[in-house]
Regions:
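Membrane topogenic/interface segments and analogous intrinsically disordered interaction regions
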Residues: 1-252
């Protein structure tokens, strides 16, 4: 085996990525704080929308508030999720704009034309928004109504009265909604990582089982802590990962 064989995980690019994240830390923290600032005032309207949404509250379920701080904590949670969303959007935009130049400063061929960068950024933005909308539709029409209806019927089947705490219910719903929007960004994130050389296609294909497990684990982290939610969030991530690999193969 010769020494020029490319590493499955390019360590030089990975180290440069870590350096890039450190340099962007101030910007990312700023975007998170901006998300908190924007998210908290509008979180009241978001809560009202969820309360009125079809299928989010089964007919035989009663909502209660146990502690006076529940609404404030809910608004902070929603604002935090918006802040995290802005941080991820910033990373995607920066990575798509700078490309390999961001990761490998020795690359001289990534300067490109300004118009090319604009086109690439526009494509990434439209793709990200489109994937987010698809994720939101999946959560709104399939994931949330199906799960809540299942949980309500399961409790009724054993003779229990469905009385849900506002914070627990809405935290569950917003967690699923946020997880769906983020998880549907998987194809875009994988393609950006492949095209910038941070990871190689060999790494993804050779470690497919581990990545599938990681996707399900990430689904458990992003979604409420129950097995059904984990598979309903992590499952689409696995499918979207395979779609992104197919797109990468076709577009090369």
């Amino acid at each position: 085996m010769n020494g020029s064989q490319r590493d499955i995980i390019p360590m030089a690019e990975f180290v440069n990525l870590i350096k890039y994240l450190k340099k962007r830390l101030t910007v990312l923290v700023g975007m998170f704080i901006l998300g908190l600032g924007i998210g908290y005032p509008i979180s009241g309207d978001i809560i009202s929308w969820f309360l009125q949404a079809n299928g989010y509250l089964p007919d035989d379920v009663e909502l209660i508030i146990i502690q006076p701080m529940e609404v404030i904590l809910l608004r902070l949670r929603i604002a935090t999720q918006i802040g995290i969303g802005l941080v991820l959007a910033t990373l995607i935009i920066d990575l798509s704009w700078n490309g390999k130049k961001l990761i490998n400063k020795s690359n001289k061929n990534e300067n490109g034309l300004y118009s090319t960068k604009i086109m690439r950024l526009s494509l990434v933005l439209f793709s990200s928004i489109g994937l987010g909308i698809i994720g939101a539709i999946y959560a709104h029409n399939v994931l949330i109504p199906m799960l809540l209806d299942f949980l309500a019927k399961d409790a009724s089947a054993v003779g229990l009265t469905n009385t849900w705490q506002l914070q627990s219910w809405l935290g569950f719903v917003t967690g699923l909604f946020f997880a769906s929007v983020i998880s549907f960004q998987t194809p875009l994130a994988v393609l950006l990582l492949l095209r910038t050389g941070i990871i190689s296609r060999d790494f993804v294909t050779d470690n497919r089982g581990l990545i599938w497990f990681s996707a399900l684990l990430l689904g458990a982290v992003l979604s409420p802590p129950d097995p059904v939610s984990m598979f309903l969030v992590g499952g689409p991530m696995v499918i979207l990962l395979e779609i992104s690999l197919l797109v990468d193969r076709i577009s090369k």
